[in-house]
Amino acid sequence: LDLLETLHQQIRFRRTDQLQRFLDLGYRANDTMGHFKFGPVKFLCDGSLGSHSAAMRQPYHNDPDTKGLLLFTDEELYDLAKLAYTNGYHLTAHCIGDAALEQMINTIQRVSTEFPHADRRNGIIHCQIMDEALQDRFRKLNLVAYVQPIFIKADSAVVDDCVGAELGRQSYNWRRYEDMGVHMCGLSLIHI
């Protein structure tokens, strides 16, 4: 009796040449190696709210000199996502700030329009700072929200200071996702 389950592993690349080398070695989406299965390609698109490195569309309310940090240009993210997507990989991304969320939503929309695949389950991890217009776009793309409730307690103390009361009110609005029919799961960074 084999008691081990298959580990579905997200894989992360920073540049297209890294992913291309991986593909050149023959690794494909859903390939297995024993109990190891290649899952989605993961993009780390921004940082964290408390450090002011989550990428925001507007300057931080309590630090007007910064909007955080996008870790990809639009074209870098598109090129990497396109290479992963056209080779059968689902796309998933760490996005906390609304600029990172918008960038990834734009990228997924562009790639999935150019290369439609009904079987893809693309998703975004965190989904924290997002107004209702972005939430609506998220739903229309049928993305999975990998929410992390563990951060609510710490972030609730700083969210309004960081993004202002109006955007803070619309953020972490996972009840609205549920009402809209967004597929969600709660998890922690341990599995990422």
Give, region by region, the residue ranges found by the protein language model:
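Conserved small/polar residues in nucleotide/adenosyl-binding loops
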Residues: 190-192
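Metal-coordinating catalytic core of metallo-dependent amide/deamination hydrolases
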Residues: 1-98, 102, 137-144, 149-150
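Flexible glycine/proline-rich, aromatic-decorated loop/lid segments
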Residues: 56-61, 143-177
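Short, hinge-like loop/turn segments at secondary-structure boundaries
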Residues: 25-26, 109-112, 142, 162-165
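Short gly/Ser/Thr-rich phosphate-binding loop of adenylate-forming enzymes
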Residues: 131-136, 176
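Conserved helix-loop functional segments at active or binding sites
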Residues: 83, 106-114
